Regions:
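Phosphate-binding glycine-rich loop
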Residues: 31, 35-77, 83, 91-94, ...
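Conserved active-site segment immediately N-terminal to the catalytic lysine
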Residues: 155-189, 216-221
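Active-site PLP attachment segment
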Residues: 172-208, 231-234
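Conserved G/P- and acidic residue-centered "switch" motifs that form tight phosphate/ATP-binding loops
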Residues: 61, 96, 156, 185, ...
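PLP-dependent aminotransferase class I/II
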Residues: 37-45, 49-55, 114, 118, ...
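PLP-dependent aminotransferase-like
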Residues: 70-148, 152-157, 164
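Structural detector of well-ordered beta-strand residues that form the stable sheet scaffold
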Residues: 56, 79, 100, 153-154, ...
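N-terminal "arm"/small-domain region of PLP-dependent enzymes with the aminotransferase-like
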Residues: 1-32, 349
Length: 369
């Protein structure tokens, strides 16, 4: 048996020879950044692929989150989830905004709409939910609350590339949706991100903000930032799109393999989507409860001892980090579900190049424990 390490994820890389022609075009144009032809082509291609009207590319998803908040002039307090990558809440603090944590739904692991309303104060200006693992939030319930209280909704959709509900792209919901194209994501540009914009006017403001606030050669209208994606990153994205169908199909097959092999394992719960969603299978999280022979951490270590490097996404909670734990909303009593899930979760390896032999190594450990 091959004992080569198996990591929780691995970037999808198309054949190198297919990337060379894109690089040759960049060398010939001598345009490396500032909205060059590759950048413009990728924005258009993503609009078509995702079924959205306007895409603003960024150099990474965190800068995109920061800029989205600036674009909507969000201030005060924003209700968000503690169960996410730290960039979600960091983007708020960097904008001088106070995160207010609300608990998550025990089934979807997304922000629980029934907990949002109680967290609203006169200082609340927005809600920032996360489509965790690419599973859509209850967008209708969240939007209803936002409408009732005149709040903005910015979705951290870092996990949700290509995800659709019955009406189309999940990215069409809220005021803005923010994507990450980091190397670990199902669609990557090495580093990168994007904001999905509802209209041309909003995209224009976002494009200005990501270019230091410039509107022309001599006019600056806002304190912007350098959030521009380079031509090399955009070119890689164009090539990646050509391979997405094959990569997504392989992820779907791996997801099905895990579900079939683990369905009889007592003490393991697989996180399911809504059932009305076109999923991207970006992660494969399981929850390890008291009926499993090993604790979550013991299973995590056993996998590691066998060369399988799963991850405890998301542990610890954002609310446990020093810059957040002193906040009233970060208290464990306010977040019982999120704390329980964080103590149980393991994400198993999932990426297109995984072989059946490697997958069987993973499932055998869970079956035999």
């Amino acid at each position: 048996m091959n004992n080569k390490p198996v990591y929780v994820t691995q970037p999808y890389l198309p054949p190198l020879e297919e990337f060379i022609p894109y690089l040759q075009q960049i060398w010939e144009s001598k345009v490396l950044t500032n909205g060059g032809p590759m950048h413009e082509q990728l924005e258009a291609a993503l609009c078509d692929y995702l079924g959205v009207e306007h895409v603003a590319l960024f150099n990474n998803g965190t800068i995109a989150l920061l800029t989205a908040l600036q674009a909507l002039r969000v201030t005060g307090e924003v209700i968000t989830t503690p169960y996410s990558f730290v960039a979600t809440s960091h983007s708020l603090l960097w904008n001088g905004i106070r995160p207010v944590f609300a608990d998550i739904d025990p089934l979807t692991l997304n922000l629980d709409p029934t907990k949002i309303e109680a967290a609203i104060t006169p200082q609340t200006t927005a809600i920032m939910p996360v489509h965790c693992y690419g599973n859509p939030c209850n967008v209708e319930a969240i939007q209803k609350i936002a409408d009732n209280y005149n709040l903005r909704v910015i979705y951290d959709a870092a996990h949700a590339f290509g995800v659709e509900d019955s009406g189309g792209s999940i990215l069409r919901h809220g005021d803005l949706s923010v994507l990450s194209f980091h190397a670990t994501k199902v669609f990557n540009t090495f580093e990168g991100g994007a904001i999905i914009c509802p209209d041309a006017r909003t995209k224009k403001r976002i494009d200005q903000l990501k270019n230091f606030g410039y509107v022309d050669e001599v006019t600056v209208v806002a304190p912007g930032i350098n959030g521009k994606m380079s031509e090399v990153n955009a070119a890689f994205g164009l090539l990646q799109l050509k391979h997405m169908s094959k990569a997504m199909q392989r992820r779907r097959e791996i997801d099905q393999f895990y579900r079939e092999e683990l369905k009889e394992v007592s003490g393991i719960r697989m996180v399911d989507g809504t059932g009305q969603t076109t999923a991207n299978h970006s992660y494969f999280p399981i929850l390890v409860d008291a009926n499993f022979p090993l604790s979550r951490d013991a299973l995590y270590q056993k996998l590691k001892d066998h060369g399988i490097f799963a991850r405890r996404y998301f542990y610890p909670l954002i609310s446990e980090f020093p810059m957040y734990r002193g906040m009233n909303s970060a208290h464990r009593s306010n977040l019982p579900i999120a704390n329980d899930v964080a103590e149980q979760v393991i994400c198993l390896p999932i990426y297109p190049s995984l072989s059946i032999e490697q997958l069987s190594r993973v499932t055998a450990i869970l079956q035999e424990s």
